[in-house]
């Protein structure tokens, strides 16, 4: 599992040892999820530069507002490799590989390291979480938004089911077996260590899918309980999470793997988190 330092940096995952882990039983002892107590991160988003600014992002540099959003849409929608839903399994084994154990992946909401071979539907297995819930726009698992690895992550099956298709917001009761995650009737709050990751994945989807090429027009809004509408919230909270939890080495590496070997496009908000505030003011 990953831990965060006092400076807000995410440390490599720590594997199960009796003195480091607190084991919590889930579903009356059927499932055990190992977790550690972690420190919230706080940081201000500042302007960044990347090796891609003079090439990949050259048509976006210097823009703001809708012109920036539209430029990024064109950039991240060009020459993209689209996966089938079955191909997502193997892709996630690359993108979310545990840097300390190449046989494992890191699960999004719990932060645990679990065998790549443990993918499935059982409560103690991991499955493919659509961070932008697939019912929001009703795109299902269709090639395109339903298989875009930039918002698909390995997640514990039980915790994924608890999140369901809820919008993201702060508050609620702590999720049993997944400390740091909270939920209520219409929203889900992930643990502090991945709040920014979640925000940047959701905002990527809102830029990538704008109603062209037969895909739904996905838009973030400042609501919860969006149902099957092609909207996901809560925008004001997502912006806050982007500010407070900046991209770390794991998230940046994941972006590189997707670009280099999987889809061949990037999440611009990992490379330039300050662009969130330039588009959604």
Regions found by a protein language model. Give the residues of each.
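Secretory targeting and sorting signals
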Residues: 6-44
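Short, His- and charge-rich active-site/binding loops that engage polyanionic ligands
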Residues: 104-107, 111-125
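N-terminal module-boundary/linker segments of secreted carbohydrate-active enzymes
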Residues: 34-111, 275-281
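Polar low-complexity intrinsically disordered regions enriched in Ser/Thr and small residues
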Residues: 11, 32, 65-68, 180-183, ...
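Domain-level detector of nuclease and nuclease-like folds
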Residues: 120-281
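Intrinsic-disorder/low-complexity peptide segments enriched for small residues
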Residues: 22-25, 66, 236
């Amino acid at each position: 599992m990953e831990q965060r330092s006092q400076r807000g940096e995410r440390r490599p995952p720590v594997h199960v040892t009796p003195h480091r882990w607190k084991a919590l039983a889930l579903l009356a002892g059927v499932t055990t999820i190992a977790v550690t107590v972690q420190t919230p991160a706080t940081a201000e988003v500042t302007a960044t530069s990347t090796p891609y600014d003079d090439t990949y992002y050259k048509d976006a540099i210097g823009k703001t507002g809708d012109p920036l959003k539209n430029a990024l849409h064109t950039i991240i929608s060009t020459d993209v490799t689209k996966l089938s839903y079955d191909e997502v399994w193997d892709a996630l084994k690359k993108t979310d590989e545990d840097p300390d154990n190449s046989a494992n992946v890191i699960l999004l909401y719990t932060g645990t390291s679990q065998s790549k071979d443990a993918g499935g539907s059982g409560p103690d297995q991991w499955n493919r979480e659509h961070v932008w819930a697939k019912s929001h726009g009703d795109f299902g698992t269709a090639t395109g938004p339903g298989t875009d690895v930039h918002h698909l992550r390995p997640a514990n099956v039980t915790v994924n089911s608890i999140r369901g298709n809820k919008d993201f917001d702060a508050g609620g009761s702590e999720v049993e077996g997944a400390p740091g995650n909270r939920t209520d009737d219409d929203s889900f709050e992930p643990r502090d260590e991945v709040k920014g990751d979640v925000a940047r994945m959701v905002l990527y989807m809102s830029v990538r899918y704008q109603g062209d090429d037969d895909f739904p027009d996905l838009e973030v809004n400042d609501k919860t309980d969006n149902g099957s509408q092609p909207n996901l919230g809560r925008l004001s909270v997502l912006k806050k999470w982007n500010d407070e939890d900046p991209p770390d080495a794991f998230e940046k590496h994941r972006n590189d793997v997707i670009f280099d070997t999987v889809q061949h496009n990037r999440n611009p908000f990992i490379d330039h988190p300050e662009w969130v505030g330039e588009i959604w003011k």
